[in-house]
Each structure stands twice: as structure tokens, then as C-alpha cells.
Amino acid sequence: YAVREGRKKVTAVHKANIMKCTDGLFLDVAREIAKEYPQIEFTDSIVDAMCMRLVMHPEEYDVLVCPNLYGDIVSDLCAGLVGGLGLTPSANIGKDGAIFEPIHGSAPDIAGQHKINPTACILSASLMLAHLGEAKAAAAIEKAITDVISEGKALTQDMGGTASTEEFADAVIAKL
């Protein structure tokens, strides 16, 4: 993934100092795989220290590789750094397939109320397009979203506006 996406650094996030068997194995495998990609800088970090550092210096990180439990926690922390769950897409990319989805889940408590921010869903589709080799289409979607948010006219409630889900989506479509 890091090579294909032009990334420069991968950090394995673990708790191998305590979880010696499971996270120790994860870290050993990460280090072995890293040897196959000498052009990519590889580091590892204990999850709690990395979370503190990520908040203080997010620019130090590029790709974080985590076991599922830590990945779930770290991804929510990262969502907070960029404005919240409503803005955050996710990609789970494996050897033989990939899944793209909003990080926030289905939000059943506000289903049908037309007030959910669709940005994470739209950006997840953009990530999928990029993964499928449609970089221009992905970039166009990202630019449209950036433009709509920057203008501030069609923002959903979580971004301080009054626009409905559909109004925000329509504004993005209009930019495309």
C-alpha cells in the first residue's frame, strides 16, 4: 500500500511490551515485511505513546499499521484531529480486496432525520475510486467537498450549519 500510494513512512503501532505473544508476533511480522521495502522508512511505536505524539505532532506520521483493536481507537482519535467522525472516510485494504466505508458507522439514532453529514461516505467513495485507478475522479470529488466546506453555505449541523444531508450532497454535486 505504502509503495503504491507514494508514502514514505510506515509505523507499526503495538503494545508488544505488555502483549508479548500477540503484539510481539505482530511486531516481528511487521519488521520482516519492512525489510522487503527498504525505500520505505519503518518505525514502530507503543500505542499509548503514539496516541499522545499523534495529537501533538501528527505530521510525524504517514501510514499507521495497527491490529484491529488499536486501529479502531486510533482511527477515532485521527477523526477528532480533522473535524470529527462525520468527515472521516476509511479504507481497509488487503491483498485480495478492499472495503471503503465511513468511519462513523450507520448512526441509527439519527437515521431518516436528514441531518447526517455525508462527507465521510462521499470521501469513502473517493478513496475507492483512487484505489481503482480513477485518481482524477477521486481528486474532483475531494476538491468539490473542500470547496463546499470552504464556502460555508451548505454545512450540516455538525459543522455549524443548517443544511440537510441532501442539501450538502447537492452542493457537492453542483461543484462537480
Please report, for each region that a protein language model flagged, where it lies by residue:
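Glycine-rich phosphate/diphosphate-binding loop of Rossmann-like nucleotide-binding domains
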Residues: 1-48
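Glycine-rich phosphate/pyrophosphate-binding loop and the adjoining helix
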Residues: 1-5, 10, 16-19, 135, ...
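Hydrophobic alpha-helical scaffolding
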Residues: 16-20, 40-44, 63-64, 115, ...
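Short glycine/threonine-rich loop-to-helix capping motif typified by GTGT followed
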Residues: 20-29, 55-62, 79, 153-155, ...
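Conserved structured core elements
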Residues: 24, 44-48, 119, 135, ...
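Glycine-rich phosphate/nucleotide-binding loop
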Residues: 53-153
